Amino acid sequence: PPANTARFSWDNTVDVDQYICQPSSAPTPDDATGAVSLSVSEVNEHAVIIPNLEPSTEYTVYAFYNGAICARATFTTKKGKPVGYTEYNGVEALIADWDNLSGNILVTISADADLSNKSEIPAAVTNIVFWGEGATQPKLAVKNMQTLGAIDKIEFYNLNISALSNDCVIAPNTEGSSIANIEITSCTIENYRGIVRMRKVNGESSLKLNIDDCIIRNLGTKGTNNYYGIVQ
């Protein structure tokens, strides 16, 4: 489900007139107290859109008929955009302000974009998130991304991260720099020599790499030597 809504549907043979949706950590309701009544159209369509949900949260929805639970389902909402970040709408806006970047940066990407010519993240950046907007993953080309200072996290979400040449996604190569965390979630990664190549970055042994819900294609196919794979 998206970050803030979910569609709950049930079989045509099941009668439902109310529902309760709550975090899965909450106890199972004893009755229909506080339940939301379905509209005539929702009853006829055997489906309802549940609004006002929190991102990255597991919920259980209980379907009721005549005051009794008749069905239930558990789901987890998708991630939501981080708060407290300076947001740039598109890679072009980010590049235009590149030398002034600092603090927490959120880049919202809704169309295919090329960032391969801007590989050195400015030293004043603390966290940077590349956020793919929409149901279809926008393509983002990056090349040997690194940081000029100490950065807490580089994150990619809902993107098709594609190589244009014989590169890695992230390849720190600056003395005195460090990366604490790299997160790649709900992305497609394709045609890279490797994902992370460690070279001269300090503290490389403590770097945490988290790849979750991703498709990886043709990893290492561009490599002509031994340093290719997830991490080199």
Residue ranges and their predicted role:
Residues I50-A71:
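Beta-strand-rich modules
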Residues S110, W131-E133, Y157, S162, ...:
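Feature marks extracellular polysaccharide-active and adherence modules
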